[in-house]
Amino acid sequence: MRLSQLLKSKLHHARITYCNPDYVGSIEIGQDLMDAVGLQDGELVHIWSVTGTSRIQTYAFAGPRGTIGINGGAAHFFESGEKVIIAAFDLSDEPILPKIVLLGEENQIVKDMTPFSVIG
């Protein structure tokens, strides 16, 4: 059996609503968004800036609708209003159909991009 690391969840064009360097760490994501793409509290996520060059990994936890908050040291790498991609991966020996959503200016879902497509 050979395991591959495959995309399972993606929040495309999320907007950071706050940065708090004094928090212990992690990213706070609206519960509605976590549910939409199958993310769990404590799950490892990758955060890639669309408007800058930062790329980090941290763990996610659920927050209020519309929230995308960067906490801890990672807050020094991002700014409120910055556009990011949040992704999570899973190990599998079978294909995974990733859950992908495109977000609008207020972190609302504007398009369900599942099934996976390279066409925006």
Q: Predicted regions span which residues?
A:
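Extreme N-terminal tail/first-helix region
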Residues: M1-L7
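Helix-rich terminal scaffold detector
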Residues: L3, A62, E94, K99-G120
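Compact, glycine-rich, soluble single-domain proteins
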Residues: L6, I16-T17, P21-E94, E106
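Eukaryotic proteins' extreme N-terminal regulatory segments
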Residues: H12-H13
